[in-house]
Swiss-Prot record:
Protein's gene: cysN
Annotated residues for binding of GTP: 34-41, 113-117, 168-171
Domain spans labelled tr-type G: 25-239
InterPro entries: CysN_GTP-bd, CysN_II, CysN_NoDQ_III, G_TR_CS, GTP-eEF1A_C, P-loop_NTPase, Small_GTP-bd, SO4_adenylTrfase_lsu
Organism: Salmonella typhi
One GO BP annotation of this record: sulfate assimilation
Stated name of the protein: Sulfate adenylyltransferase subunit 1
Length: 479
């Protein structure tokens, strides 16, 4: 067992008291990104090592692994704490997204270590999609590179507002202040083109030697700012979803017995309380909240991010993929939208193609109408293209098969973010972020044949646990 952890548990008065204290700490999700060999995995290993998060058996194993796979000579290769795949260790690179967890007295952390190679940009986008902060590593010898720009743009595109530019390997440039100042100026010049109001901070460090990671460096007395760990512990994360209206995508209809019917999911934004009037989209039917069931029992009110089951006062037709919002809110369903896309498939994205798309719990089909432009990562300019290649980032116009309740991604990532799924292979081939909604062309009501209506009624009557929707949109429930 970790000796420091044992001391912390003892100081809190036992395991139960320690666990309660952990629950009340704030959580920060962050990722490390940047160009290949900039030291991302080594930095995470250093954070884990210097915050005493490594168990004795892990440390012993690390000594042995460093001798077999290490790239640092006689020193501990801290990157091996994170690079777990055999191919990663053999090549000395990160391929998959690796997640690590640690905590200090002030905060809990979830780290996503993302790959630096261009061909794994899609893995990096996956890691960034759930993070609040990005650490962008820059090799002090190389300065700002294409992958640095690419990862910076993807991070901001995915809604990350806090960027920490960690200028690493300062030991290899003799800890020179002018090197740090030059790279800082270069990055700030580039960052003027990034979207959004960003909080950008700079820390000169050496992940290998531990300078300015968890402790102040004696080699860079010219730097008087906080260490990287101090930045992570004190940064104030303001989540946009906390200030947005209530959105609750239904993930699952929970019906363990005939006397209970609840709608499970994670509250995407805002808050909801018992007695509040809510509206269901797309049907528009209204009801009120009777109970809010959580893992810790019933609650009177919950906020964004909590996993809950809502029980309503009325037995109405609600299925997976429906969206619950406050009754006084208006959210017009849209069939057309402009979507920022990070493309992840070998086959390019081109106009005329159709894909399954998944938005929260909702799955439908969409058609690519046009590729507006592709972003040139080198200078963030827009260029006309006929298709979007693997790892390409651009803006596309799409039409959905049915009207969808969507939000702008920067306002609500859950109800404004979607993934593209290949209809034949069922493989995720792209990620999309809603930029603009186009409510043109009101969709005429769908006309169903007599056979379709009879079959729908039969299914709802004899198989109520399937939660089939009434095609005519009646307000009575399926049960």
């Amino acid at each position: 067992m970790n000796t420091i952890l044992a001391q912390q548990i003892a100081s809190e008065g036992g395991v139960e008291a320690w666990m309660i204290a952990q629950q009340h700490k704030s959580l920060l999700r962050f990722l490390t990104c940047g160009s290949v060999d900039d030291g991302k995995s080594t930095l995470i290993g250093r954070l884990l090592h210097d915050t005493l998060q490594i168990y004795e058996d892990q440390l012993s194993s690390l000594h042995n692994d460093s001798k077999r796979h290490g790239t640092q000579g006689e020193k501990l290769d801290l990157a091996l704490l994170v690079d777990g795949l055999q191919a990663e260790r053999e090549q000395g690179i990160t391929i998959d997204v690796a997640y690590r967890y640690f905590s200090t007295e002030k905060r809990k952390f979830i780290i996503a270590d993302t790959p630096g190679h261009e061909q794994y940009t899609r893995n990096m986008a996956t890691g960034a999609s759930t993070c609040d902060l990005a650490i962008l590593l820059i090799d002090a010898r190389k300065g700002v590179l294409d992958q640095t720009r690419r990862h910076s743009f993807i991070s901001t595109l995915l809604g990350i507002k806090h960027l920490v530019v960690a200028i690493n390997k300062m030991d290899l440039v003799d800890y020179r202040e002018e090197t740090f100042a030059r790279i800082r100026e270069d990055y700030l010049t580039f960052a003027e083109q990034l979207p959004g109001d960003l909080d950008i901070r700079f820390v000169p460090l050496s992940a290998l030697e531990g300078d300015n990671v968890a402790a102040q460096s004696a080699n860079m007395r010219w730097y008087s700012g906080p260490t990287l760990l101090e930045v992570l512990e004190t940064v104030d994360i303001q989540r946009a979803v906390d200030r947005q209206p209530m959105r609750f995508p239904v993930q699952y209809v929970n019906r363990p017995n005939p006397d209970f019917r609840g709608y499970a999911g994670t509250l995407a934004s805002g808050s909801v309380k018992v007695g509040e009037r809510i509206k269901v989209l797309p049907s528009g039917v209204e009801s009120s909240v009777a109970r809010i069931v959580t893992f810790d029992g019933d609650k009177e009110e919950v906020c964004a991010g909590e996993a809950i089951t809502l029980v309503l006062n009325d037995d109405i037709d609600i299925s997976r993929g429906d969206l619950l919002l406050a009754a006084n809110e208006t959210l017009a369903p849209a069939r057309h939208a402009a979507i920022d896309v990070v493309w992840m498939a070998e086959q390019p994205l081109a106009p005329g193609q159709s894909y399954d798309v998944k938005l929260a719990g909702k799955k439908t089909r969409a058609r690519i109408e046009a590729i507006c432009y592709q972003i040139d990562i080198n200078n963030l300019t827009q260029r006309d293209v006929e298709s979007l290649p693997l790892n390409g980032i651009g803006l596309v116009e799409m039409t959905f098969d049915e009207p969808l309740a969507l939000d702008i991604y920067q306002q609500n990532p859950v109800t404004g973010g979607l993934i593209f799924i290949d209809r034949l292979s069922n493989v995720t081939v792209g990620a999309g972020m809603v930029r603009e909604l186009d409510e043109r062309g009101a969709t005429p009501p769908v006309e169903y044949s007599a056979f379709e209506l009879e079959l729908n009624a039969l299914v709802r009557r004899h198989f109520p646990h399937w939660d089939a929707r009434d095609l005519l949109g009646d307000k009575h429930g399926a049960a």
